[in-house]
Amino acid sequence: MYPSAMSILTLKVNGRSQQVDVDPSTPLLYVLSDDLELRGPKFGCGLGQCGACTVIVNGQATRSCVTPVSTVGSNEITTLEGLGTAEKPHPLQQAFIDEQAAQCGFCLSGVILTAKTFLDRNPRATDEQIQQALASVLCRCFGNVRMLNAIRRYAGGRTA
């Protein structure tokens, strides 16, 4: 096995330019968690199938565990931490707080960031459309109506 060549890459993460010295084939998830110490995206399956590692890259929900860091280039990367702060959460994060929608929290990065990107493109989505958009995010507690209520609240306060 040959050692991989390291490269200094500049990433724009949560509105800040960050330089990292990494193997260009390293999954974005590892750079975000190990090098930049961001804990929003989680390692779930490592295959891009569960959604726990979801981040937003140029407005698109992206599975960071299967995205080589070199492919994001100078694109804007947003993690769950980049949406808001503890003092001033993003309205979707606040809706999850208000609805007490989080249980274990492992899937929250996937649920919240997927919902945000979907609703940014489809602000008048129906409950069925929202559920379809989130079908690729695995969550043992997504049957909990509180998550859907939080997403509805963010999308404009629709009721069931």
Question: Where in the sequence are the language-model features?
Answer:
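Signature of N-terminal electron-transfer/Fe-S-associated modules in redox systems
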Residues: 1-160
